[in-house]
Amino acid sequence: MDSQRNLLVIALLFVSFMIWQAWEQDKNPQPQTQQTTQTTTTAAGSAADQGVPASGQGKMITVKTDVLDLTINTRGGDVEQALLPAYPKELGSNEPFQLLETTPQFIYQAQSGLTGRDGPDNPANGPRPLYNVEKEAFVLADGQNELQVPMTYTDAAGNTFTKTFVFKRGDYAVNVNYSVQNTGEKPLEVSTFGQLKQSVNLPPHRDTGSSNFALHTFRGAAYSTPDEKYEKYKFDTIADNENLNVSSKGGWVAMLQQYFATAWIPRNDGTNNFYTANLGNGIVAIGYKAQPVLVQPGQTGAMTSTLWVGPEIQDKMAAVAPHLDLTVDYGWLWFISQPLFKLLKWIHSFVGNWGFSIIIITFIVRGIMYPLTKAQYTSMAKMRMLQPKIQAMRERLGDDKQRQSQEMMALYKAEKVNPLGGCFPLIIQMPIFLALYYMLMGSIELRHAPFALWIHDLSAQDPYYILPILMGVTMFFIQKMSPTTVTDPMQQKIMTFMPVIFTVFFLWFPSGLVLYYIVSNLVTIIQQQLIYRGLEKRGLHSREKKKS
C-alpha cells in the first residue's frame, strides 16, 4: 500500500459519495414514524378536510422593517410575499432575495388564523375573515424597536377577533397574537392554525443551480416534536397523498430550501396536530392546528404563535424554538459539520474573512490528524520494505493462493505491519471533507462570502476555474513525490490521470471547498517531507528518484 493507491481509495470514496447523493435526489422514501405518528392518505384539496380554508381576495398591506419587507392579505391575514433586504437575490444585485411569493407561476405563502367550531377561518362559517386595518403601509421607523400591525374582524354575532403581527428590529421571528372578545351568551371554541403552502415545481426564476450536480441541497418540509427532534418530509411524498398526522405538545413545522426557511411555532401548553396535505394544482402544505380554546361569554381570550421567515441563522433560530437550528441542512454528517462551523465562526470573529478562516481551520484539522497521517506513511513505508520478501514468496509458492495468503499474514504479523494501516486515516479524513462540503452548502454566513482577488463567493464555483486547476497541480506534486510500488500498467495509467479526473470533478464545487483541498494538499506536501526525513533515519525510506 502506498500513497498512489491511496488516491484510488479517495476516488472510490468520492465517487461513492456522488452516486449516493444522486440516489438521494431520486428516491422518495416514506418517513419513519413513531408512536405518536399516524400516516394517512387524503385527497387533493384536503386543506378543507383539515379545517384550514382556502385563500381569498382582499386588500394588500405592506410591512417594512430593517430586515423584512412583507405583503399581507387582509382576507385571512396571510403573508403572501416576503423580501429579505439584507440578502441580495444574486451576488452584486440590488434586488432583494424573495422567499415568499404569490404569482401565477409560483405560490409560497404563510397562512394563519383561527379555526375550530366558532373560528372565523372555519370554512363552515363562511369565507375567510376580511380584516380591517388602520392603514395600508407600516414601517419600522428609525429608533423604533418594535412595530405592531393590528387587524380586526367582527362577525355577524358581534364577536371581535383581533390578529396582531409583532415585528422587532433585526428579528426574523414574527409573533402573531390573537385576541377573541366574546360578546355573546355562549362560549366560543377556537383554535389557532399555521400553514405553509408551496408549489412543488420551481419556475425558472427560482430554480437556481439545479443543473449543477455539486449543488444539491434539500428542499421540502420538516417538523419537530419532543420525540422527533428533526424530521424531513419530501414534497413528492406529500404530493403522493401520503400525509403526516402527528399529535404533540410543543414543536414546529417548516418549509426549507438552501440557506432559507419558514416555520410556524405554536405557543401554547396544549396539544398540537401537525399535518401535511396535497392541496391540488401542484401545491402542497405543512401546518399545525392547536388544541381548541374556550372563551367564555363576556371574556377575552388570548393566543399566540410565531412565524420564522428568513435566513437559517443557527443561533437565532435556536433561541426561537428548540431544534429549529437543525433546519440548517448539514446532511447525515451534521454531528461533524456543526462543530466545524462553530469553530469556523469563532475563527472568523478574529480574522474577519471566511476564506482565511477556512485556511486556518484546514491547518487545525490537519494538525489534529497528523499522528494518523504519520502512522499512514509509516505503514506504507513498512509495506514497501516488505515488497521484496512478498515477491519472493509469490514466486516460491506459485499459484497456491491459500499458502500465499497464510504466509503473507504471518509475515505481516512478524514484522508488525498492518496492511490496512494506510487506509484508516483516509477513511477518517473523508467524513471531515464531506462534512465541510455540507457546511459550505448549508451555512447562510458563507453565501456570497468573498475571499480575495477573483473569489467573491466561497459558496459558488470558481468562475475562472483557477482554484480547481491549482488543486489538480497540488495533487500532481503529491503523486510525483510519493514512492510507488505499482507495476501494473493499467493502475499506472489510472494514477497518472487521477489529478485530471479530480480537477474535472472539482470544477463545479464551491470555491471554499476547493480552497480547503488546496491548502490540505499543501500541508500534505510539507508533512510528507517531514515524515520522510524521520523514516530515512529509521531506514524505512530512501531519496531515490521516483520511477514514473
Curated annotation (Swiss-Prot):
Biological process, per Gene Ontology: protein insertion into membrane; protein transport
One GO cellular component, as annotated: plasma membrane
TM region positions: 6-26, 350-370, 424-444, 458-478, 499-519
UniProt topology in membrane: Multi-pass membrane protein
A GO MF label: membrane insertase activity
Subcellular locations according to the entry: Cell inner membrane
Keywords (A to Z) from UniProt: Cell inner membrane, Cell membrane, Chaperone, Membrane, Protein transport, Transmembrane, Transmembrane helix, Transport
Main location: membrane
Region (Disordered): 28-56
Entry keyword Membrane: yes
One Pfam family of this chain: 60KD_IMP
Compositional bias of kind Low complexity: 29-42
Subunit structure: Interacts with the Sec translocase complex via SecD. Specifically interacts with transmembrane segments of nascent integral membrane proteins during membrane integration.
Similarity comment text for this entry: Belongs to the OXA1/ALB3/YidC family. Type 1 subfamily.
PANTHER family from the UniProt entry: CYTOCHROME C OXIDASE ASSEMBLY PROTEIN COX18, MITOCHONDRIAL, OXA1
Job description of the protein: Required for the insertion and/or proper folding and/or complex formation of integral membrane proteins into the membrane. Involved in integration of membrane proteins that insert both dependently and independently of the Sec translocase complex, as well as at least some lipoproteins. Aids folding of multispanning membrane proteins.
The protein, known as: Membrane protein insertase YidC
Native species: Salmonella schwarzengrund (strain CVM19633)
